[in-house]
C-alpha cells in the first residue's frame, strides 16, 4: 500500500534557444524492442529495494517507488510538445530522488547503442525519461461484484490493462497490438469475438486515434478512425449476432482534438446498439459530436454509461 507507481515515458528533449524543450513525447514512437533494452538498462543500473523499473509498450513504461511520495507532480509530456520544460521540473528537496534518477538516465542513455543506432538512422533518440501520472493502488469493485459479469480487456496500453486487472478482467494479449497506427485492428476485433464465447463482457480499447491527435496529424487521425471503423467495428458487428443476444457500446474515453493536441473535458458521443435497446429514445441519424448534442441525451456522471450498457437503462 505504500508503493507509488509513476508513469515513465521515454522522451526526446532538445535545446532550443538555450531552453530545454520537449521535442517528442514518444521518442519517435520508439519500438517496444528498443525500449525494453533501455528499461532493462535502467533496472540494472538503478533498480534496488526502493526503485523498480518495468517495461511496457513503445514509449510507455512504469517506475515503482517503494514507500515513495505521490505529491510530486509533473505534467503529461504530450501537453508540452514544442515547449520549454524548464518551469515544469520540480526543484523541491522531496523531488530530488526523482530528479536524480532522471539526470542519471540522461547520462546513461546518451551513448546507449539503441540511441546511437536511432540517431544514425535519423530517428529521435530516447535521451531522457519523464516521470508523471503517479498513484497508489486503487480500491475498486470488480465487474463481478458490481454487475455479476465475467469479462476481459483488450488493449496495447498498460494503464488500461491495469485498470482491467483491478476490475477483475482477464487481459487478452493480441499479437501486433502496438498502441499506434500500425496496430493489429482486425486481430483485436477477432480476439473480442473469441473472448465473448466464454465471457459476458469485453472492453476493447484502441489508442491509435489518440496518438495521432497528440501528434497533431489530421491525416493520421482520419486513417486511425477509418481503420477502427472498418477492421474493429466491422469485424465485431459482422459476427457478434451469432453469439446470441448482445449489446455494443462505442465511444471515446475522452476527446483529443488535433488542433489542441491534448485532452479536453467535453462530453463524448456514444452509440449503443443491440438486443433490447430502445432506438427511439434518443435516435440520431449519424455518429458525431453534432448529432450527439442534438439528441439531448447526456449521461451524468459518465460512469453511469455502464448501467445503460448492462441494464439497458440508466439507474
Kindly give the residue locations of the regions a language model identified.
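Feature captures the catalytic ectodomains and active-site-proximal regions of enzymes
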Residues: 1-315
Amino acid at each position: 500500500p505504500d508503493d507509488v507507481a509513476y508513469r515513465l515515458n521515454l522522451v526526446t528533449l532538445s535545446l532550443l534557444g538555450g531552453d530545454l524543450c520537449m521535442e517528442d513525447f514518444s521518442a519517435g514512437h520508439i519500438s517496444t524492442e528498443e525500449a525494453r533494452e533501455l528499461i532493462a538498462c535502467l533496472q540494472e543500473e538503478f533498480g534496488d529495494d526502493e526503485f523498480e523499473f518495468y517495461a511496457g509498450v513503445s514509449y510507455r513504461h512504469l517506475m515503482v517507488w517503494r514507500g515513495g511520495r505521490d505529491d510530486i507532480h509533473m505534467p503529461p509530456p504530450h501537453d508540452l510538445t514544442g515547449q520549454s520544460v524548464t518551469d515544469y521540473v520540480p526543484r523541491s528537496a522531496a523531488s530530488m530522488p526523482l530528479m536524480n534518477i532522471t539526470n542519471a538516465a540522461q547520462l546513461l542513455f546518451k551513448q546507449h547503442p539503441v540511441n546511437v543506432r536511432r540517431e544514425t538512422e535519423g530517428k529521435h533518440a530516447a535521451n531522457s525519461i519523464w516521470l508523471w501520472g503517479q498513484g497508489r493502488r486503487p480500491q475498486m469493485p470488480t465487474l463481478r461484484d458490481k454487475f455479476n459479469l465475467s469479462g476481459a480487456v483488450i488493449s496495447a496500453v498498460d494503464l488500461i490493462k491495469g485498470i482491467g486487472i483491478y476490475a477483475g478482467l482477464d487481459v487478452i494479449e493480441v499479437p501486433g497490438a502496438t498502441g499506434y497506427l500500425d496496430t493489429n485492428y482486425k486481430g483485436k476485433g477477432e480476439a473480442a469475438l473469441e473472448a465473448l464465447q466464454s465471457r459476458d463482457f469485453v472492453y476493447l480499447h484502441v489508442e491509435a486515434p489518440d496518438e495521432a491527435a497528440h501528434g497533431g496529424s489530421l491525416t493520421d487521425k482520419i486513417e486511425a478512425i477509418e481503420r477502427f471503423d472498418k477492421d474493429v467495428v466491422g469485424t465485431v458487428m459482422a459476427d457478434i449476432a451469432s453469439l446470441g443476444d448482445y449489446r455494443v457500446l462505442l465511444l471515446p474515453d475522452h476527446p483529443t482534438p488535433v488542433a489542441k493536441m491534448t485532452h479536453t473535458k467535453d462530453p463524448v458521443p456514444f452509440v449503443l446498439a443491440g438486443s433490447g435497446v430502445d432506438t427511439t429514445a434518443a435516435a440520431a441519424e449519424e455518429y458525431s459530436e453534432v448529432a450527439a448534442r442534438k439528441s439531448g441525451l447526456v449521461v451524468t456522471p459518465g460512469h453511469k454509461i455502464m448501467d445503460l450498457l448492462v441494464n439497458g437503462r440508466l439507474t
